[in-house]
From Swiss-Prot:
It is found in: Cell inner membrane. NCBIfam families: NhaB, PRK09547.1. The gene is nhaB. PANTHER family: NA(+)_H(+) ANTIPORTER NHAB, TRANSPORTER ARSB-RELATED. Keywords: Antiport, Cell inner membrane, Cell membrane, Ion transport, Membrane, Sodium, Sodium transport, Transmembrane, Transmembrane helix, Transport. This is Na(+)/H(+) antiporter NhaB.
Length: 514
């Protein structure tokens, strides 16, 4: 092996050779285009390359390739470190949210696992169970991070799948076996296992869409919501009320879609939990409930009280979102007996890589601002009539968010809209409506692919996906009815309900104009 071969083997680790080569080519081309052709073209090239790294997240986590591209952009002068720092400081609350809120909810997983386990065992109707999962995921995602909600549901599904797989392969529940190996599955159990996989697939997708339905409603539902709220100066309640004319109709239609795809067994939905599996899981749940000690029950009670504090703290904006998250960590660890540094450290593993990636986003946003990359698009949209502007912002955001990361897209568009407001191009009232269009545009159509929703990408890359045969293509196919309904209802609500509803809410004194 030559030195170059050894270097390339280390470079970006286990990523495919063609992917490594593509990143190297990007790094070579960008300075050439910037210095000898056009900084504007080089800027757009960087944005396209960055979107490519997000779309290829399954090949390599975008932090490394995206980070290399961003560092090079700063070195060659597309932007500068001071501007990047300014963007980071302007969005510091989002960073606090990701670091502390996600970690805080980690210590409440026991309560969330308990709730979802009871739902799965107690509700026998598949339609009712699907709606319950979708609704519960939506409600939780309005107050918690969507990644955490999906992580909990994955834990429940993994646990149940593992239990039944062991039974179907003739093992005891305490045996350590590879649940991805189907070779020992008893012949007559194969069909039941396939039905169970289809059942779990549909539940995971309903819950995933539920996180999008709930996440769009509140400041803390998705990271980009907080970025938009910061620019528009909206607190928790005002953000909820501003979004409600769009999010409430979308939420109702989302639950209706859940009912219809289950009722008529469309797009891979409709498979019921086999009776044989339910009996095994029900027996296990009963055994676990009987084994629960007084100490365990007190832990659940404390976590429920902490959840109430979380909701009240957010609703009345008692502190910055990230600081409420920090208080959750302190309360949850203090009252459930978690005092070991290494155990506490595990809570931060989930959020810190994405936090680092978000800082890279802000570097690319700084390039977009310095090179005025979005100016032609923004001028085109803002030259349209006011009502048309809302639809165009929604559609452009939706299209980009379905192939890229919605935090990145929302950050870019809200910055451009704020600049237009500052320069007197749009009126404050129009900026408020555009902020709603940007938020709903990035959150709703982005369920189309795993690239757009971080929770979907997390599900796709989790260990449950290969077990239940949930591939990228199947996720896109199963998300399709939701994509169509959420996108169209969102657009209609933006166009026909939002302007009048905003004026009505303002007349009641429920929202305050800028």
């Amino acid at each position: 092996m030559t030195n170059i071969q050894a270097f390339m083997k280390n470079f970006l680790g286990a990523s495919p050779e063609w992917y490594k080569l593509a990143i190297v080519v990007f790094l070579i081309i960008n300075p050439i285009v910037f210095f000898f052709i056009s900084p504007f073209i080089a800027g757009w090239l960087l944005v396209a390359e960055f979107i490519f790294t997000l779309a290829m997240a399954l090949k390599c986590y975008p932090l490394q390739p995206g980070g290399l591209l961003a560092i090079e952009a700063i070195i060659i002068g597309m932007t500068n470190a001071k501007h990047v720092k300014a963007e980071i400081m302007a969005n510091f609350e989002v960073i606090l949210l990701l670091i502390f809120m996600v970690a805080g909810i980690f210590f409440m997983k026991q309560l969330l696992l308990y709730v979802f386990t009871k739902l799965l065992v107690k509700i026998r109707s598949k339609i009712a169970l699907s709606i319950a999962f979708c609704f519960s995921a939506a409600f939780l995602s309005a107050f918690l991070d969507a990644l955490t909600v999906v992580a909990v549901i994955i834990s429940v599904a993994m646990g149940f799948y593992g239990v039944y797989h062991k039974v179907a392969s003739g093992n005891n529940l305490i045996d350590a076996v590879d649940i991805s190996d189907d070779r020992k599955i008893i012949e007559q159990q194969h069909e039941i296992l396939e039905k169970f996989r289809a059942f779990l697939r549909s539940l995971m997708m309903h819950a995933g869409v539920g996180t999008a339905l709930g996440g769009v409603m509140t400041v803390v539902g998705e990271p980009q919501n907080l970025i938009i709220a910061e620019q528009a100066k909206w607190n928790f309640m005002e953000f909820f009320l501003r979004m409600a004319p769009v999010t409430i109709p979308v939420f109702i239609c989302g639950l209706l879609t859940c009912f219809l795809v289950e009722k008529f067994k469309l797009f891979g939905y409709g498979e019921k939990l086999p009776d044989e599996v339910w009996k095994v899981l029900s027996d296990l749940d009963r055994t676990n409930s009987e084994k629960m000690s007084k100490q365990d029950k007190i832990k659940l009670g404390m976590q429920a009280l902490i959840a109430i504090w979380l909701i009240l703290g957010l609703a009345f904006h008692l502190a910055a979102v990230g600081l409420i998250g920090l208080s959750i960590i302190i309360f949850a660890t203090s009252f459930t007996g978690v005092t070991d540094e290494h155990t506490i450290g595990k809570a931060f593993q989930e959020s810190l890589p994405f936090t680092a990636l978000l800082v890279v986003f802000f570097s690319v946003v700084a390039v977009i601002i310095d090179q005025k990359l979005f100016s032609p698009i923004i001028h085109f949209v803002l030259s349209a009539e006011e009502n048309t502007q809302l639809a165009l912002f929604y559609l452009f955001n939706g299209l980009l968010s379905s192939i890229s990361d919605n935090v990145f897209v929302a950050t870019v568009y809200i910055n451009e809209a704020k600049a237009a407001l500052t320069n007197g191009v749009i009126a404050p009232h129009q900026f408020e409506l555009l902020s709603v269009a940007i938020n709903t545009g990035t959150n709703l159509p982005s369920v189309a692919t795993p690239n757009g929703q971080a929770a979907f990408l997390f599900l796709l890359t989790s260990s449950i996906s290969p077990l239940i045969r949930l591939s990228y293509g199947r996720m896109v196919y199963m998300a399709l009815p939701y994509t169509i309904v959420l996108s169209i209802i969102g657009l209609l609500a933006i166009e026909f309900i939002l302007p009048a509803a905003t004026i009505w809410l303002a007349s009641l004194g429920l929202i305050l104009p800028i």
